[in-house]
Regions:
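N-terminal, positively charged regions that mediate nucleic acid binding
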Residues: 1-74, 79-81, 159, 170
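Short, acidic Gly/Pro/Ser/Thr-rich loop/turn segments
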Residues: 14, 20, 125-126, 278-279
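Short acidic, Gly/Pro-enriched loop/turn segments at secondary-structure junctions
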Residues: 17-24, 129-133, 203-206
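SsDNA-processing nucleotidyl-transfer enzymes
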Residues: 61, 65-147
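Short, surface-exposed linear segments at secondary-structure transitions and domain or protein termini
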Residues: 32-34, 125-130, 217-225
Length: 378
C-alpha cells in the first residue's frame, strides 16, 4: 500500500529582546540558575504583567516579512496547565486572536518552489527549565528562562517529506535571523520545532492520526525523527495496529521516537482572555514605522540577483540563504568579481570549508576583498 506523508510544524522562536515578555527582568543566557527570576515569573500575588513593546515589534516585523495578515487587535489568553517550571499554573499566550494571521513561506525543493502556508504566529512567554538526574536522584528548576518572549509560528500541514520539513525549518531559521528578531542559536533553545506527523492512504482526503514530536533543536534531528516516525506509523498500521494521538520525544542516541503523553486538545488548556492585559492594538503608524525598519528581504534580493546578475534561481537561493553570505557576495560584486564565479567560490569552496571547520562566516580568515582579487585573476 502506498502512503502520503502529512507534516505540519510549530516553531518556537525566542525573540531577541533584552528583557522578558511581561517584566523588566533580563533575558541573557548562561547566568547562575534562578538569578533572573522576577516577581511576575515567580507568580507573586498582586504583581501585574507589562507587555514588552519590542517583542510586539518583532512579531509585526515577522508578519510583514511573510506577507501575512497583521491583526490590528489581538488578545492575550491564559493557557492553563500544571508543570513544576510554570509557577503561575498558566502560560500567557494568544489563542483566538493572534497578532499575526495567515501568510506563507516559499521553499526550494529539487529546483521547484513550494509555498508553505503559515496559519498564524502568536506571542507568548516561555516556561522555566527542569533539570533531571541531579545528585541523589533529584530534579532542579531554573526559572531564568521563564517569561522569555517567544513567537510561536504555526504552519498548515503542507509538507510531505522530511526533506521539505527541513527545507522549511532552515528557511524560517534564516529569515528570523535576517530580519533581526532572533539570534537563531539552536543549542541554547532559541529556535525549537514541534513537528506533527501523520500518514494517510495515497490520494485519500481523510487525514491520519497525528503524533507531535516535541522540542527538536537541530535540522539533523528533524529529518531523523520524521523518517523514523513515518516508518513506525506505516509499519504499525500495516501490522493491524492503530495510531493514538500523542506527544512524543525523539532520542538522538537511539534514533527512535517514544510516546510521552496523550496529545492535548485546545479545550484541555481552558483558554480564556487574560484579565490583566488589555487588547493589543496595532496602529497604522506602528505598521509604517516597522515596515520602514525592515531590510531587503531574502526573496526580494533573490529576485534582484536573478534579474540583474543573471544568476539561476538555485544560485540566488543559495547566496541569499544567510545574510552574512549575501553581504559577502555583494562585497565581491562591488569589487568587480564575476557573479557566477563568486557564487561558486563562496558556496562550494569557502563556506563549505568553514562549515566543516565549524567557523562562523563572520570569522572567515578570507575576507571578501581577498577572494574577489583571486576570482578576478581567473
Amino acid at each position: 500500500m502506498d502512503w502520503d506523508i502529512v507534516i505540519g510544524i510549530e516553531t518556537h522562536v525566542q525573540l531577541k529582546t533584552k528583557t522578558k515578555q511581561f517584566s523588566g527582568a533580563s533575558t541573557s543566557f548562561g547566568n547562575e540558575p534562578n538569578s533572573q527570576g522576577c516577581l511576575v515569573s515567580l507568580a507573586y500575588p498582586g504583581v501585574l504583567p507589562v507587555l514588552n513593546q519590542e517583542a510586539v515589534n518583532c512579531a509585526i516585523k515577522f508578519g510583514l516579512s511573510i506577507d501575512a495578515i497583521i491583526n490590528r487587535k489581538s488578545i492575550f489568553a491564559r493557557k492553563n496547565y500544571f508543570y513544576p517550571d510554570l509557577p503561575k499554573g498558566y502560560q500567557i499566550s494568544q489563542f483566538e486572536l493572534p497578532i499575526v494571521g495567515e501568510g506563507k513561506l516559499s521553499i526550494l525543493i529539487d529546483n521547484h518552489t513550494k509555498d508553505v502556508r503559515i496559519l498564524r504566529a502568536h506571542l507568548e512567554e516561555d516556561a522555566g527549565k527542569s533539570s533531571h538526574g541531579l545528585s541523589h536522584g533529584k530534579s532542579g528548576i531554573d526559572l531564568n528562562r521563564a517569561g522569555t518572549p517567544l513567537l510561536e509560528i504555526v504552519t498548515e500541514p503542507d509538507m510531505s517529506s522530511a526533506e521539505e520539513a527541513v527545507a522549511y525549518a532552515k528557511k524560517l531559521h534564516d529569515l528570523v535571523q535576517w530580519i533581526g528578531i532572533c539570534d537563531g542559536n539552536m543549542q541554547e533553545g532559541n529556535f525549537r520545532c514541534d513537528v506533527n506527523v501523520s500518514v494517510k492512504k495515497k490520494g485519500s482526503d481523510v487525514l491520519g492520526i497525528r503524533r507531535e514530536i516535541k522540542n527538536l533543536n537541530s535540522f539533523k534531528y528533524i529529518k531523523q525523527a520524521i523518517d523514523y516516525e513515518v516508518n513506525w506509523q506505516i509499519e504499525t498500521i500495516e501490522d493491524g495496529g492503530f495510531i493514538e494521538q500523542s506527544t512524543i520525544l525523539f532520542n538522538p542516541d537511539t534514533g527512535e521516537t517514544k510516546a510521552m503523553r496523550s496529545k492535548e486538545e485546545a479545550n484541555d488548556y481552558r483558554y480564556f482572555p487574560d484579565p490583566d492585559l488589555l487588547p493589543l492594538i496595532v496602529t497604522d503608524e506602528d505598521m509604517l514605522t516597522i515596515k520602514d525598519s525592515l531590510p531587503e528581504l531574502p526573496s526580494e534580493m533573490q529576485s534582484r540577483f536573478v534579474k540583474d546578475l543573471k544568476l539561476s534561481m538555485y544560485d540566488a537561493s543559495e547566496i541569499t540563504s544567510n545574510k552574512d553570505v549575501a553581504d559577502y557576495f555583494i562585497g565581491m560584486i562591488n569589487e568587480g568579481a564575476s557573479a557566477k564565479l563568486s557564487v561558486n567560490w563562496i558556496v562550494v569552496n569557502l563556506f563549505s570549508r568553514l562549515n566543516d571547520e565549524e567557523i562562523n562566516s563572520l570569522d572567515s580568515p578570507v575576507k571578501f576583498k581577498k577572494l574577489a582579487d583571486l576570482v578576478l585573476k581567473i
